[in-house]
Amino acid sequence: MRFSLAWKLLFLILTCKIETQVKCLKFDFPGFNVSNELELIRDNSYIVFGAIQVTPDVTGGPGGTIANQAGRALYKKPFRLWSKHKSATFNTTFVINISNKTDPGGEGLAFVLTPEETAPQNSSGMWLGMVNERTNRNNESRIVSVEFDTRKSHSDDLDGNHVALNVNNINSVVQESLSGRGIKIDSGLDLTAHVRYDGKNLSVYVSRNLDVFEQRNLVFSRAIDLSAYLPETVYVGFTASTSNFTELNCVRSWSFEGLKIDGDGNMLWLWITIPIVFIVGIGAFLGALYLRSRSKAGETNPDIEAELDNCAANPQKFKLRELKRATGNFGAENKLGQGGFGMVFKGKWQGRDIAVKRVSEKSHQGKQEFIAEITTIGNLNHRNLVKLLGWCYERKEYLLVYEYMPNGSLDKYLFLEDKSRSNLTWETRKNIITGLSQALEYLHNGCEKRILHRDIKASNVMLDSDFNAKLGDFGLARMIQQSEMTHHSTKEIAGTPGYMAPETFLNGRATVETDVYAFGVLMLEVVSGKKPSYVLVKDNQNNYNNSIVNWLWELYRNGTITDAADPGMGNLFDKEEMKSVLLLGLACCHPNPNQRPSMKTVLKVLTGETSPPDVPTERPAFVWPAMPPSFSDIDYSLTGSQINSLTELTGR
């Protein structure tokens, strides 16, 4: 960094109008696990079974009971709601699941904004963990909530099945029953809720599916100035309660996005900032000299440091000596496996097990693969994605640190020579497939920028201690933007042979459809226990026909598709259920990319929301260019500069 940059920054500060700064507070929990406890403030609430139990379940409550409990779970970082001249806006969407344990159940759950981290004493029962008999109707309570009430506890309640807006009070400002909408809050079914505040009006939407934003799902909209009831800074989260009437109050997923007000500008701020900028400029200059001297010694790479410092995803930076100590200096006894990009070692850091990937010096694009992993998954949080904990670059060593997966990669369980040793039951395999579909659907549709994995295969699927699947190895992954342009040609083909869609060899393009194809091959692998290059007939056939896909289509044509079942399952499976999964896998492997289902459709089939797509008994011929889809679609693609080479077909 040069002095001129500091002077330019100083000039901008002096000439710009000093205004209130606004930042975006944004987080997304597609599901919950124990590691998320560090991101929440919990008061008598727990993370169990992939959800926040806002009031304890049977095993978690004081004295082993769920009666007469109040609980609270808040996001750890406070949200600045307003300042002298500005009011924040926010949107939040969450999936709740409330199931009664008595008949009727009680009492309810609420989304809240409050400065208080804990529920008031004696706030169980009708008080929903928000207020108690003493603080009810008291402006010092400082709480605004959207309640999902499951019991008519007082005369003002419409019924025991309504949504309401409450301000410092258990008696509602506005309430609407859901009974006329065919929705029962404590049915034990997932409900999706969306709360929107535009600075003037608060609107609430509720639906039994994910299409909550449709206007018909609007429950109520109410004009309210939140700054009149709440302090400048609040927490957002959930509160719930039970009485002698009990229920389980679960939050299964939660996302929040809002404009966070940082405060009002003034001249004091200006005069404090000017000398700081000057000092920072000098420090940056000296720092640049230091980094350059270290770079010459081969210890760091300023280009990599700068690129990672500027990206939104910025996981922890480790020291090389820390990782050497954690892995026993990368000792052979700690080696977990080896893949196309390098070796993986088990380590111990701050009392927890970690996995450290040491990117191979022979990987000619090691820097690109290294940066790709950090920039794509560094800030993703999904229960079916391997969590990236941090990175290190020192002395020409590229190192990535992940959460440790005790059961290793999926391929070592699928491709056992002695099938009788397999411990992957049909239920376990189904859960693996469903978990991976959730991960891929999240990458394609749930992120701010769509992410293509481009290397989906069994060796890139990791298993935790309960055999839950997590997709990993994002060395080839890329973030892409929507574009009205057609696909760009690429210089090289990316992926692993056997998992690559046929059109890839002709156009060299990576798309969501090529990801779906690879996922289809993986589905067939998981069910059959066969590798993608499995050959049934040992004659001279071409690569297109010599594959697990062709073998499955032959079985389907002969009416014996369930014969593909891995002998390791010992015929302990539902044939119709397996047939449905195999047909879905074949649909994903359709030669025409425009005929493959989206991951959203795949997930709906796996969760029983819809039937598998129609699959022809004869495998369609591969024709290029493919027949266009029957609808207009927005194109997602990668440019040539974003392509890497093929990866080796080996496990970690």
UniProtKB/Swiss-Prot annotation:
Disulfide cross-links: none
Residue intervals on the Cytoplasmic side: 288-652
Residues exposed to the Extracellular side: 21-266
Catalytic activity field: L-seryl-[protein] + ATP = O-phospho-L-seryl-[protein] + ADP + H(+); L-threonyl-[protein] + ATP = O-phospho-L-threonyl-[protein] + ADP + H(+)
Stated name of the protein: Probable L-type lectin-domain containing receptor kinase S.5
Region (Legume-lectin like): 24-257
Topological category with respect to the lipid bilayer: Single-pass type I membrane protein
Signal peptide: 1-20
Family to which this protein belongs: In the C-terminal section; belongs to the protein kinase superfamily. Ser/Thr protein kinase family. In the N-terminal section; belongs to the leguminous lectin family.
InterPro entries: ConA-like_dom_sf, Kinase-like_dom_sf, L-type_Lectin-RKs, Lectin_legB_Mn/Ca_BS, Legume_lectin_dom, Prot_kinase_dom, Protein_kinase_ATP_BS, Ser/Thr_kinase_AS
Residue positions binding ATP: L336, G337, Q338, G339, G340, F341, G342, M343, V344, K357
Entry's Gene Ontology molecular function annotations: ATP binding; carbohydrate binding; protein serine kinase activity; protein serine/threonine kinase activity
GO cellular component term, pick one: plasma membrane
Enzyme nomenclature, EC number: 2.7.11.1
Transmembrane intervals: 267-287
Residues carrying a glycan: N33, N91, N97, N100, N122, N139, N201, N244
Main location per the UniProt record: membrane
Location of the active site: D455
Domain named Protein kinase: residues: 330-622
Record-linked SUPFAM superfamilies: Concanavalin A-like lectins/glucanases, Protein kinase-like (PK-like)
Natural source organism: Arabidopsis thaliana
Record keywords, A-Z: ATP-binding, Cell membrane, Glycoprotein, Kinase, Lectin, Membrane, Nucleotide-binding, Receptor, Serine/threonine-protein kinase, Signal, Transferase, Transmembrane, Transmembrane helix
Compartments, as annotated in UniProt: Cell membrane
